[in-house]
């Protein structure tokens, strides 16, 4: 599983967890194809995003102009949470690479406007987090 696929599967897993009251292991099982093995990167994205979700949600909430996190679409919320986790906690991946991958995921699911929205929210949230460190 390459990193692009891992990100896609992680978003799908996180999306499920916002919609259905199931545990993370069941969501992972539901997401992966029978022949797919979860990569270490995928596991890090899913579990790390969930572990730091409260902190991540705080930064995202501060930067959602005219929105609340609950009003944000489930897919956009999953992409934003995962993207910000990766930007803040996975130092081996350049921030601009993570940002671009999140934008591409958003555009694939929601079009160009979704990509612009994710770009703005993640950029501002990351900048705020860096000022607070």
From Swiss-Prot:
Gene3D superfamilies, per the entry: NusB-like (1.10.940.10)
One Gene Ontology MF term: RNA binding
A biological-process GO annotation: transcription antitermination
Alphabetized UniProt keyword annotations: RNA-binding, Transcription, Transcription antitermination, Transcription regulation
Record-linked Pfam families: NusB
Gene Ontology cellular-component annotations: cytosol
Function per UniProt: Involved in transcription antitermination. Required for transcription of ribosomal RNA (rRNA) genes. Binds specifically to the boxA antiterminator sequence of the ribosomal RNA (rrn) operons.
Family: Belongs to the NusB family.
Protein name stated in the entry: Transcription antitermination protein NusB
Organism field: Shouchella clausii (strain KSM-K16)
